[in-house]
Amino acid sequence: MSWIERILNKSTITSARRANIPEGVWTKCDSCGQVLYRAELERNLEVCPKCDHHMRMTARARLHAFLDKGSESELGSELEPKDILKFRDSKKYKDRLAAAQKATDEKDALVVMKGELYGMPVVVASFEFAFIGGSMSSVVGARFVRAVEQALADDCPLVCFSASGGARMQEALMSLMQMAKTSAALARLRERRLPYISVLTDPTMGGVSASLAMLGDLNVAEPKALIGFAGPRVIEQTVREKLPAGFQRSEFLLEKGAIDLIVRRPEMRLRLASLLAKLTNRPQPQDPLPHEPRPDAVPEDHQDEV
């Protein structure tokens, strides 16, 4: 111990050390409260290495992690939302859009890309929950239809990662219409016998769960994802009964047959590639499953900062 450490108390030294740590280097798990190294968490696809809690992931990060590196090409980026109804609740809709676009650096709540998955051509859509709760707008519907049309043109499968609170109320019937519009587009994909895999992440609710999210040839979910139409509290107040433990979580839905499979995020890429290879009569991907995340993955030189 140095002479300065003998003079100063431990709390003063700890506070000084913390003050020198750049913001965003560390984060805390929403489930277990473990302090995690931000860069390591990103490498682990936002899955806590201690309790395996699947945190929310941005649409663009998910797409880049899922598709083969260098194969990605964005679709529908020119489509932008408009406040046709001049809607206003506690805030103008155009102001909500501007705030969401600034916060997420996205134009709307769905990002679509075409690319390759283990060398297989595929079109992938992913919801951005941070953009007004991933709500389904007319642009979201248009981009999803664009994804279907690209899959039809390329004669390839479609994968969609859902994370949404439902229809966007600020667009009224134009938003609700997207439920029918996206469902009709998927019917065209089914007629061509092209696979559609829907991946339900936390949360997938409302009009999205009642349309495109549950229409997959395979409906896959991440662990402990909240999936349903109305929230548990609303249902309890309506039926005036206590709901079962874990109601509307992916494990409960799998047990009741509402979904087909639960897949951990680090294993998602290979598992879906394997399923798509079977559905399209292609050779199975040969890469091994990603290694399990290590709970001691924090670099040694940062251990004293936890």
Swiss-Prot record:
Cited PANTHER family: ACETYL-COENZYME A CARBOXYLASE CARBOXYL TRANSFERASE SUBUNIT BETA, CHLOROPLASTIC
UniProt enzyme class: transferase
Domain of life: Bacteria
GO biological processes: fatty acid biosynthetic process; malonyl-CoA biosynthetic process
Matches recorded under Gene3D superfamilies: 2-enoyl-CoA Hydratase, Chain A, domain 1
The keyword Ribosomal protein is annotated on this UniProt entry: no
Basic and acidic residues bias locations: 289-306
Reactions it catalyzes: N(6)-carboxybiotinyl-L-lysyl-[protein] + acetyl-CoA = N(6)-biotinyl-L-lysyl-[protein] + malonyl-CoA
GN (gene name): accD
Pathway: Lipid metabolism; malonyl-CoA biosynthesis; malonyl-CoA from acetyl-CoA: step 1/1
EC code: 2.1.3.15
Membrane spanning stretches: none
Record flagged with keyword Zinc: yes
Cofactor(s) demanded: Zn(2+)
Subunit structure: Acetyl-CoA carboxylase is a heterohexamer composed of biotin carboxyl carrier protein (AccB), biotin carboxylase (AccC) and two subunits each of ACCase subunit alpha (AccA) and ACCase subunit beta (AccD).
Region (Disordered): 281-306
Record-listed Zn(2+) binding positions: C29, C32, C48, C51
Cysteines engaged in disulfide bonds, as pairs: none
Keywords: ATP-binding, Cytoplasm, Fatty acid biosynthesis, Fatty acid metabolism, Lipid biosynthesis, Lipid metabolism, Metal-binding, Nucleotide-binding, Transferase, Zinc, Zinc-finger
Physiological role: Component of the acetyl coenzyme A carboxylase (ACC) complex. Biotin carboxylase (BC) catalyzes the carboxylation of biotin on its carrier protein (BCCP) and then the CO(2) group is transferred by the transcarboxylase to acetyl-CoA to form malonyl-CoA.
Family: Belongs to the AccD/PCCB family.
Phylogenetic placement of the source organism: Bacteria, Pseudomonadati, Pseudomonadota, Gammaproteobacteria, Enterobacterales
Protein's UniProt name: Acetyl-coenzyme A carboxylase carboxyl transferase subunit beta
A GO cellular component entry from the record: acetate CoA-transferase complex
Pfam families reported for this sequence: Carboxyl_trans (PF01039), Zn_ribbon_ACC (PF17848)
Domain CoA carboxyltransferase N-terminal as annotated: residue spans: 25-294
Compartments where found: Cytoplasm
